Swiss-Prot record:
One of its GO terms (cellular component) is cytoplasm. InterPro entries: Metallo-B-lactamas (IPR001279), RibonucZ/Hydroxyglut_hydro (IPR036866), RMMBL (IPR011108), RNase_J (IPR004613), RNase_J_2 (IPR042173), RNase_J_arc (IPR030879), RNase_J_b_CASP (IPR055132), RNase_J_CS (IPR001587). Optimum temperature is 60 degrees Celsius for nuclease activity on RNA. This is Ribonuclease J. Its cofactor is Zn(2+). Keywords: Cytoplasm, Exonuclease, Hydrolase, Metal-binding, Nuclease, RNA-binding, Zinc. It comes from Methanocaldococcus jannaschii (strain ATCC 43067 / DSM 2661 / JAL-1 / JCM 10045 / NBRC 100440). Its main location: cytoplasm. SUPFAM superfamilies: Metallo-hydrolase/oxidoreductase. One of its GO terms (biological process) is RNA catabolic process. Its EC number is 3.1.-.-. Substrate binds at H383, V384, S385, G386, H387. Zn(2+) 2 binds at D85, H86, D173, H409.
Length: 448
């Protein structure tokens, strides 16, 4: 018997997640993501027009050339959820493998959009929808199970590969939200059942391992937004809320609050249109009937003209640009590149924390500084993370009781912090906790 886990991407950084599991020559790929901060560094780059080798060189997508040295055949590409750091490299890499792409309904719809926008490669891999709670035989020896989990995007799952040698559980990304705004609670029964049946290896995200306690549920963010928006004296002023375009639950909360305020909710931005439009089309979420969505620049321009003409106080704008990204709607508004001109006491609510890297921090600081100079009231803190904190990770380890652990989706500070937690639970670095670099392979050999 030979089972290998190949760390292709996401084992030295946050992002560009990609892992391969080789079971006696039958290979399953888990996720194909991009590294978002590298996209920002190369801000003039249109990824859709570039060759995969250029993107590998820039550190934007995983370097899957390591797969040339792996003996076996790829049988499936399995996606855990729809964030770009997990699916963004599909248009660049999937065509190399004669294998279907498997994901939940929302994830597959997002992948379809990514493939349609690709200008360099012709991606023809079959797309297979698998719902949370369902299983599918990938080969006679490997069964894939999707366990429902919560994260900051709907339809997220824990993919589990059931093999003759034990299960491989892929925990990128998750939180335990017992009060979700959209969707259901995690399937704790299924998680514990997998643990009882025997987990050979658990691959776990580490993004928020350095935060004590447990990550609060999404309903807390909803309450904070109500506090900011309903309690403030802003009846006569413009209100703009900015958050992650993929955070459908958060956007649902904001649009519902707009309705309570008697304001028409307006979504602005291409990514807002993509993520929210798909979620609404497939029935994942029900937004207020008067919701308006504008994606392309000309329609956004026209929408803002109408808002100014009819009165800012009649609308609540939900815009892209919470990280201060140049070219995002909020950044363009703050630099007077749209018909919407900020006035004193207009409100901007940031319902997202800055992504922790220097470039994001600098861009966000510049945006906030510009808004303050214009007399804008700024509200921050109406946010909860979509990632597990330390005690969530401890619970997961106790339920799964894996023989081996591979920390991932983080730099070495984060994976080392996860190792400390694992050692508190009786594991030992180098024995059953394994810190891998991108391109490295961990082999398990045993007799059944």
């Amino acid at each position: 018997m030979k089972l290998e886990i190949i760390a292709i991407g996401g084992y030295e950084e946050v992002g560009r997640n990609m892992t391969a599991v080789n079971v006696d020559g039958e290979i399953i790929i888990l996720d194909m993501g991009i590294r978002l901060d590298r996209v920002l560094i190369h801000e003039d780059t249109d990824i859709s027009k570039l060759h995969s080798l250029e993107l590998i060189e820039k550190g934007i997508i995983p370097n899957d050339t390591v797969m040339k040295n792996i003996e076996g055949e790829v049988k499936a590409i399995v996606l855990s959820h729809g964030h770009l750091d997990h699916i963004g490299a599909v248009p660049k890499l999937a065509h190399r493998y004669n294998a279907p792409i498997i994901g939940t309904p929302y994830t597959i719809e997002l992948v379809k959009r990514e493939i349609l926008s690709e200008k360099k490669f012709d991606v023809r891999n079959p797309l297979i929808v698998l719902n949370a709670g369902e299983s599918i035989d990938l080969t006679p020896n490997i069964t894939l199970e999707f366990i429902r989990i919560t994260h900051s995007i709907p339809d997220s799952v824990l993919p589990v590969l059931h093999t003759p040698y034990g299960s491989i559980v892929y925990g990128n990304d998750f939180k335990f939200d017992n009060f979700p705004v959209v969707g259901e609670r995690p399937d704790y029964r299924a998680i514990k059942k997998v643990g009882k049946n025997g987990v050979l290896c658990f691959i776990s995200e580490t993004t928020r391992i350095n935060h004590e306690g447990k990550t609060p549920p999404e309903i807390i963010a909803s309450g904070l937004l109500k506090n900011d928006l309903l309690a403030a004296d802003n009846d006569k002023h413009g209100i703009i809320v900015t958050t992650f375009s993929s955070h459908i639950a958060r956007i649902k909360s904001i649009t519902d609050i707009a309705e309570k305020m008697g304001r028409t909710p307006v979504l602005l931005g291409r990514s807002m249109m993509r993520f929210c439009g798909i979620a609404q089309d497939i029935g994942l979420v029900k937004f207020p009937e008067d919701l308006r969505i504008y994606g392309d620049p000309s329609s956004i321009e026209m929408a803002l003209k109408n808002i100014v003409k009819e009165g800012k106080e009649k609308y609540l704008i939900i815009a892209t640009g919470h990280q201060g990204e140049e070219g995002a709607v909020l950044s363009r508004m703050a630099t007077n590149k749209t018909p919407y001109k900020f006035e004193k006491y207009d409100c901007v609510v940031f319902s997202a924390d800055p992504i922790p890297n220097p470039m994001n921090a600098a861009q966000r600081y510049m945006l906030e500084s510009r808004l303050k100079l214009l007399g804008v009231r700024i509200f921050k803190g109406a946010h909860v993370s979509g990632h597990a904190a330390k005690e969530d990770h401890r619970d997961m380890l106790r339920w799964l009781n894996p023989e081996h652990i591979i920390p991932s989706h983080g730099d070495f500070n984060l994976t080392a912090e996860y190792t400390k937690l694992a050692e508190e639970e009786g594991y030992r670095l180098g024995e059953d906790v394994h810190l891998l670099r991108n391109g490295q392979c961990l082999s398990f050999e045993r007799i059944i």
